[in-house]
Amino acid sequence: MQGNKSTIREYKIVVVGGGGVGKSALTIQFIQSYFVDEYDPTIEDSYRKQVVIDDKVSILDILDTAGQEEYSAMREQYMRTGEGFLLVYSVTSRNSFDELLSYYQQIQRVKDSDYIPVVVVGNKLDLENERQVSYEDGLRLAKQLNAPFLETSAKQAINVDEAFYSLIRLVRDDGGKYNSMNRQLDNTNEIRDSELTSSATADREKKNNGSYVLDNSLTNAGTGSSSKSAVNHNGETTKRTDEKNYVNQNNNNEGNTKYSSNGNGNRSDISRGNQNNALNSRSKQSAEPQKNSSANARKESSGGCCIIC
């Protein structure tokens, strides 16, 4: 997007922080999209870049300052001319974080203003294994200064443009929209905090749920085995019961036949076959008395003959 030169606003931005925190690396990454790996202590470097922020063309005049204590006398000069400040510390250096408040207090004293456009930047995010300053510590300091907060990596170009753009918006709006934007950035930070907390909680729950699921799996597996065993057991029981009933039925048939022989064939639970056997038994029993009666008759007749003769 092009604009008339007369309508293009120029912003004086000052990058402030201790030595070795990566101020030059951030600035060069923003200006040239290039990462400077070597550390070369800066006395004072100035850069210019034209950018489009929110459809508005702007020219940034960026002053990269010295962080060494021996150049502290030069600070008040560029603090007077600066419109917005990036307060940079390294997440790998607790000392650089602790001294950041003194930089802000010096800016306040020199500017003699209630509101100073400032963005707190925690650089070297890529060196997570060397971290000495937590994200929460940086966020608390930013809230104390009533300033937005970002963690950046000049090496990996993380949040570099966002840091400068956020500062330009503060300067451009003369702080008029600062509170709403700060709330927006705070919400973003809170969302990140929530995501980090949720992630940690999710990990713990995942571990706990893993054990729970494992326990349930084992329990379900045991229940499944028990159910299966129960089914098998019931099947075997049913089979054994059927076999037992079959044997009992045969035994009962034999027993009923035996009982019929003894005159107990009138039992109500006897089978049809057993009933026939019982009838045959009763017929046999009826025949036996008749046979005995004929024998007795013959015996009596025989005896009678003897008496007659």
Swiss-Prot record:
Domain of life: Eukaryota
Regulation affecting activity: Alternates between an inactive form bound to GDP and an active form bound to GTP. Activated by guanine nucleotide-exchange factor (GEF) CDC25 and inactivated by GTPase-activating proteins (GAPs) IRA1 and IRA2.
Binding site for GTP: 20-25, 36-42, 66-67, 123-126, 153-155
Residues excised as propeptide: 307-309
EC number: 3.6.5.2
Lipidation (S-farnesyl cysteine): 306
Subcellular location: Cell membrane
PROSITE patterns assigned to the protein according to its UniProt record, in alphabetical order: RAS
Annotated keywords: Cell membrane, GTP-binding, Hydrolase, Lipoprotein, Membrane, Methylation, Nucleotide-binding, Palmitate, Prenylation
Residues that bear Cysteine methyl ester: 306
GO MF annotations in UniProt: G protein activity; GDP binding; GTP binding; GTPase activity
Gene3D superfamilies: P-loop containing nucleotide triphosphate hydrolases
Record field: compositional bias (Low complexity): 246-256
Disulfide bridge partners, by residue number: none
Chain intervals with Basic and acidic residues compositional bias: 236-245
Note: Present with 2050 molecules/cell in log phase SD medium.
Entry similarity comment: Belongs to the small GTPase superfamily. Ras family.
Role played: The S.cerevisiae Ras proteins modulate the activity of the adenylate cyclase catalytic subunit and therefore affect the biosynthesis of cyclic-AMP.
Protein name per Swiss-Prot or TrEMBL: Ras-like protein 1
Taxonomic lineage from the root: Eukaryota, Fungi, Dikarya, Ascomycota, Saccharomycotina
